[in-house]
Amino acid sequence: MIKQVLSVIAGLAFAIPAPAFATGFEDISRLKELVSGSGTKVLLQNCTESGIYGYYEYNQSTNVDTLVICSNTVDRKDPDAVWETLAHEATHAMQACAGGPIVDDVLVPRMLRELQEFTPHYYRILMKYSSSQKRFELEAFWMELRHPKFVIDTFTKFCYTRD
């Protein structure tokens, strides 16, 4: 009986997102340092594509990956706006380090429900992605909702710690 109760409590703890607030620019600086330290260029620049806040790309010819935060769409004075974009794009860097998805398949339905319930606008955006990109974007949107320590620890796990 106790195991069943603990199992339910653990499931609920996963389902309820932590506030997606960076404690300030310290968390942003820490994650940016980690991303840069992993070999990814982190840039702040104007983006010409409408409606995007940032992007992550890998250039095969130069073997360099780049994380861009769009200075013309992200309010750099708002740590939450910067954090959400950085956490999202850093998730794509984590996926590159891992060579694929970073969250166990069994958790995907919970992640989808969480987005649908707590951030329906993210869920609607996610549904517009192609099936080949949906899983990667799901993880990135979901990671925006996590506590900064979780994001930082997860980045360290995938991009600095090798078993």
Question: Model segments located where?
Answer:
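Hydrophobic beta-strand residues in large extracellular and virion-surface proteins
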Residues: 42, 67-69, 86
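Catalytic Zn2+-binding segment of zinc metalloproteases
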Residues: 90-107
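Metalloprotease/metallohydrolase-associated module, dominated by Zn2+-dependent proteases
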Residues: 32, 38-44, 104-163
